[in-house]
């Protein structure tokens, strides 16, 4: 029997441990650290670190955070003369503690409004609300929050302005006013316009026109957020790439702000994130209640790989890629457009295990290094 020298065994053991350690510390934020931020949306429970395992995963994989809900007006400004910063303070402190990029979401949005805002009937009252709301919140976190969604989802699918309490009271000037107020409150913070489906031609053109008009009126717009609530088969990579080019041509930073990919049936051809669209469910509409078949896992992994290849191609134009949730179990897509379905749109399953899609995104970088 051939004897193996002890020092060779020692060297082999060291090499094995080294390789294992290298594999163990690989994470999304580490492998993409020279390309763009990798972020996630945090729920209230995650901000308060209620689940240590989830918290550990967040800190390991992500270097940017967005508040999923707690900065929307119904939560942060629940009464005319009352702000509630209990959770927003914890959110910002969490990001600072973990040295993360902190994104504020959102200042002006037609949905999830505080009920008292129904009292606002005229332009004077609306201007007063916007000044108070934007100035108070942005000033409070001046120098601590890195970027803001100033206006969210102001457009219809054809690129025209969406009807809202803001448009009704002030006309389209509310858009420029919002960006001006945010810039006055914190001149150094990056200001974004954020929307869904704005990689599609008509809405893309509407987004470009909106930003041009805001700038012409003296508003500061630093970037555009493409929410990226996508499907396995749409939008096309061509549409995404054309959008990156069109927005960056205006000198805008491009962020993919709410990335997830639905795998469930969609006979209504719904796209994006119109939360007012809801339908009745059936077993046929919820085909994977317990587990996702390998065939669909593979399609999801390939879709994510194709998308991230495109992101890497244009990494000089992309500031951040944020997933809308940490794991499948918390995804809003489990309840939209049908409540109670089981969707699988993210990179981690409800048990916090990485999926094939996670590996496909990670390996794009690891194979090159």
Question: Would you name each region that the model predicts?
Answer:
Residues 41-52, 73-86, 155-160, 197-206, ...:
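Acidic-and-aromatic substrate-binding clefts and catalytic sites of carbohydrate-active enzymes
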Residues 29-33, 52-63, 89-101, 138-142, ...:
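Acidic (Asp/Glu)-rich catalytic clusters
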Residues 45-61, 128-137, 203-214, 304-310:
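Short, acidic/polar
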Residues 21-64, 68:
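Boundary/entry segment of secreted carbohydrate-active catalytic domains
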Residues 17-18:
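C-terminal motif of bacterial Sec signal peptides marking the signal peptidase cleavage site
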Residues 64-78, 87-199, 265:
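Substrate-binding cleft and catalytic face of glycoside hydrolase catalytic domains
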Residues 39-44, 150, 179-203, 255-258, ...:
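Aromatic-lined carbohydrate-recognition surfaces of secreted/lumenal glycan-active proteins
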